[in-house]
Amino acid sequence: MIKSILDNDLYKFTMQMAVLELFPKAEAEYRFTNRGSHHFSEEFVEKLRRVIDEDISALMLTEDEYQWLGENCSFLKPMYLEYLKNFRFKPGEVEVCLTEEKELDIRIKGPWHSTILWEIVLMAAVSELYFTTIEKEWNGKEWDGNISATSESILTAYGEKILEIGKILEENGCLFAEFGTRRRRSFELHDQVMKTLLQIETLTGTSNVFFAKKYGLKPIGTVGHEWIMGTSALIGLRYANRFAFENWVEVYKGDLGIALTDTFGSEAFFKDMDLKLSKIYDGFRHDSGDPFTFVDRVIDHYRKMGIDPMKKVIVFSDALNAEAAIRLKKYCQDKINCSFGIGTSLTNNSEFFRESPPLNMVIKLHSVNGIPVVKLSDSPEKETGERDALRVANYIVGRKGLDE
């Protein structure tokens, strides 16, 4: 299910290193949110607990993985690699239960640098367990997770679907990376996706470090919302974007230069993205809101700064499929460079699995040092955080009045 400590997204490791360097004593809490209508069971909770206690807790960096990171991820410092070599997941940091309403409740508490790696592995485990214990029928066939004729036929058919998607992206010149670990249907299906995508020339890499190593691909990723969210608790929300991205430069010296724009809404972001930061960062990542409006806003920002947009890039990562990527590629043509991070559409495709759609879930940072944090986003349905904290945050960034 989770095969390696590297079976995780690159940006969890890069953020872990930054937290260790700048905020080593910070305490964090994360919480799970089920945005969909899927239901869970006591049996599911017991199996998830077992995966946490027995499987994930046993993961450790191998010598081979340690050497590979040193050779292929030069931005990870030797001191951090030594830390990771000794890192072990602590099951006691994770609480799992069903509420009285039969909703799945997951809470992760502990040092920020320690708890930061749980998010992706837990989401991948939740998704795979759901589709092997609750919704076992995949397109009318029961998946058993073993090497059987039924499982092989599903994998083969899914590979054909992914190859079709990849060829469409390739024919339209769309540079893209695979971003689908967190909501994948199963590890085996994810592996099939990666094997298939090796045939596609416009594949730039994968966010999953394990598969990057296995298939000789570039690990892709920079920073997530939690870096900015955590900064807001430790330094203050009003200037969180600026401090977060200046601190990122301090740690990575220009490496990993894609800035995430929507943590507190893109307008607040662009106010903080001054000339220095706009020059240092290679581009911006779009993760919510209208992407076409965003393209125009980014181009306008660069032009006002006297920067040629054709020397910068937008990375699109908001619930993308091939059709959306192609439309955006055409819109950006001769205006600004673009690439795409495509996730669930590759690792749990809803067109292929028509009768059992992927889970709509997130695990987000809830507080740092006991201070609630929020994500405002450019899409209202993606807001996360306590109601009062959201109200104050929207007021501070100028989006709403205190009583709205």
Curated annotation (Swiss-Prot):
Processing after translation: Transiently phosphorylated on a His residue during the reaction cycle. Phosphorylation strongly increases the affinity for substrates and increases the rate of nicotinate D-ribonucleotide production. Dephosphorylation regenerates the low-affinity form of the enzyme, leading to product release.
Highest taxon of source: Archaea
A Pfam family: NAPRTase_N
GO biological process terms held by the UniProt record: NAD biosynthetic process via the salvage pathway
Family in the record: Belongs to the NAPRTase family.
Stated role: Catalyzes the synthesis of beta-nicotinate D-ribonucleotide from nicotinate and 5-phospho-D-ribose 1-phosphate at the expense of ATP.
Protein's recorded name: Nicotinate phosphoribosyltransferase
Gene: pncB
